[in-house]
């Protein structure tokens, strides 16, 4: 593979994609066809912000937290490292201490725990709150996971969410990493310019560096 080739690590958005139980189902339809308009097809999109590959803003879990447009877009573009943390129920400082993370600003975790975008998982590996201070000490500003949340699916406290942003670490969820190797990449995962939103879908892509 040429180093200039970008690799998509996003979940494709279509009407079969799984959503959080009780959340807004994804729907795309052509609401105004070329035959009707005489010139173009116009589509209509209905979705939850937390469908597919997306970022969380602090407003998602804190009424006083920053919204998407307040976030530093520089965090979502730049060098990233992918590491494998498969076969773990949870991930914290202990599990990451053996990895060389000096100089890493963006870290993507491959758990390989759930690869079906059409089925919402029942259980996922989650991040423990102690990971936040550890990542911060390493200089990491973004953490990405290949599951819908950094916290357990049924958790209401969202300790990992809170601690990560408390330590200045941004959250990227539902990336697709099973088709890429461990190593260093350039990442682009820019959120939309949504003024008042608690998160945003992203088109996440990487290329080897």
From Swiss-Prot:
Zn(2+) 1 binds at residues 50, 54, 56, 173. Substrate binds at residue 20. It catalyses: N-formyl-L-kynurenine + H2O = L-kynurenine + formate + H(+). GO terms for molecular function: arylformamidase activity; formamidase activity; zinc ion binding. InterPro entries: KFase/CYL, KFase_sf, Kynurenine_formamidase_bac. It is an enzyme of class 3 (hydrolase). Pathway: Amino-acid degradation; L-tryptophan degradation via kynurenine pathway; L-kynurenine from L-tryptophan: step 2/2. The active site is at 60 (proton donor/acceptor). SUPFAM superfamilies: Putative cyclase. Zn(2+) 2 binds at residues 56, 161, 173. Disulfide bonds: none annotated. Its EC number is 3.5.1.9. Binds 2 zinc ions per subunit. PANTHER family: CYCLASE-LIKE PROTEIN 2, KYNURENINE FORMAMIDASE. Homodimer. Belongs to the Cyclase 1 superfamily. KynB family. Catalyzes the hydrolysis of N-formyl-L-kynurenine to L-kynurenine, the second step in the kynurenine pathway of tryptophan degradation. This is Kynurenine formamidase. It comes from Bacillus cereus (strain ATCC 14579 / DSM 31 / CCUG 7414 / JCM 2152 / NBRC 15305 / NCIMB 9373 / NCTC 2599 / NRRL B-3711).
